[in-house]
Curated annotation (Swiss-Prot):
InterPro entries: LY6_UPA_recep-like, Snake_toxin-like_sf. GO terms for molecular function: laminin binding. Residues 1-30 form the signal peptide. Glycans are attached at residues 118, 163, 176, 183. Residues 233-324 are annotated as: Disordered. Residues 247-269 have a biased composition (Low complexity). Residues 327-346 form a propeptide. This is Ly6/PLAUR domain-containing protein 3. A lipid is attached at residue 326 (GPI-anchor amidated cysteine).
Length: 346
């Protein structure tokens, strides 16, 4: 290879290398965002914010703030960092039985662009001068911007509830507020006076925001409602019915069986004895009618009638076996005696 061609090839190699290096440098340059977490404090103040480089594929910086207000105060949670999704802004207001919440979410696609929301000023209007309202007699534990350690059991301060803005605050609340943004989740407890006395694990949600909890009735009843269930008095209670008495069941069963059982035997067995008992009964009645005549006339016929009474028992008595061969001579003798008696009378 001549020197001119060799120099040209080297120049092309160097040019391609520089272009490749520039491309790799441009692709490796990550998005930079501010990062901080604020939990009812100054965690996102300018002197506490940090700058972070986002992972490859992350195209937006995000910042979110959620403010909660009770009738005794307000606090806010905030998160800044690398986000996901599309650039834009989303605001929403929520109300949970008199607890107010406001959420702001903003995302942008430039370096260090997520410091536009003013987190030092409150996002909600002041709760007002509570001394201007007379207490209504209910007291509740209050957790407004307190840490979870400071809001345990009966440790929080006790506040007197009052009615404001034409609303009655006679219930106590125990719950949590949670804010999730930039792959970070922060949460704080919330306690205070609310308008509902019987809510059970109610909640409201917004973009990456949740406010939930339970209500109770009575002063200082909100020391711990996490594992308790309450039922509204407006719902009919469950009533346990007494078991039925055994005597009632037994009598009902006996009546049913005693009524139905005799019907079948009588309907099936009653025709059976009819042919066997009908013929002897007719024979007895016929012989009785024949014996009645001599008994009225007296004499030997009466003795004959008494002698035949042993062979044919009375109606309803036990049937005795007898000799059928002697029936004809006895009947002939009775007829002869009857003829003799009639001749004597004439």
């Amino acid at each position: 290879m001549d020197p001119a061609r060799k120099a040209g090839a080297q120049a092309m190699i160097w040019t391609a290398g520089w272009l490749l290096l520039l491309l790799l440098r441009g692709g490796a340059q990550a998005l930079e965002c501010y990062s901080c977490v604020q939990k009812a404090d100054d965690g996102c103040s300018p002197n506490k914010m940090k700058t972070v480089k986002c992972a490859p594929g992350v195209d937006v910086c995000t910042e979110a703030v959620g403010a909660v207000e009770t009738i005794h105060g307000q606090f806010s949670l905030a998160v800044r960092g690398c986000g996901s999704g599309l650039p834009g802004k989303n605001d929403r207001g929520l109300d949970l039985h008199g607890l107010l919440a406001f959420i702001q979410l903003q995302q942008c696609a430039q370096d260090r662009c997520n410091a536009k929301l003013n987190l030092t000023s409150r996002a909600l209007d002041p709760a007002g001068n509570e001394s201007a309202y007379p207490p209504n007699g209910v007291e509740c534990y209050s957790c407004v911007g307190l840490s979870r350690e400071a809001c345990q059991g009966t440790s929080p301060p006790v506040v007197s509830c009052y009615n404001a803005s034409d609303h009655v605050y006679k219930g106590c609340f125990d719950g949590n507020v949670t804010l999730t943004a930039a792959n970070v989740t922060v949460s704080l407890p919330v306690r205070g006076c609310v308008q509902d006395e019987f809510c059970t694990r109610d909640g409201v949600t917004g973009p990456g925001f949740t406010l939930s909890g339970s209500c109770c009735q009575g002063s200082r009843c909100n020391s711990d409602l996490r594992n308790k269930t309450y039922f509204s008095p407006r719902i009919p209670p469950l009533v346990r019915l007494p078991p039925p008495e055994p005597t009632t069941v037994a009598s009902t069963t006996s009546v049913t069986t005693s009524t139905s059982a005799p019907v079948r035997p009588t309907s099936t067995t009653k025709p059976m004895p009819a042919p066997t008992s009908q013929t002897p009964r007719q024979g007895v009645e016929h012989e009785a009618s024949r014996d009645e005549e001599p008994r009225l006339t007296g004499g030997a016929a009466g003795h004959q009638d008494r002698s035949n009474s042993g062979q044919y028992p009375a109606k309803g008595g036990p049937q005795q076996p007898h000799n059928k061969g002697c029936v004809a001579p006895t009947a002939g003798l009775a007829a002869l005696l009857l003829a003799v008696a009639a001749g004597v009378l004439l």
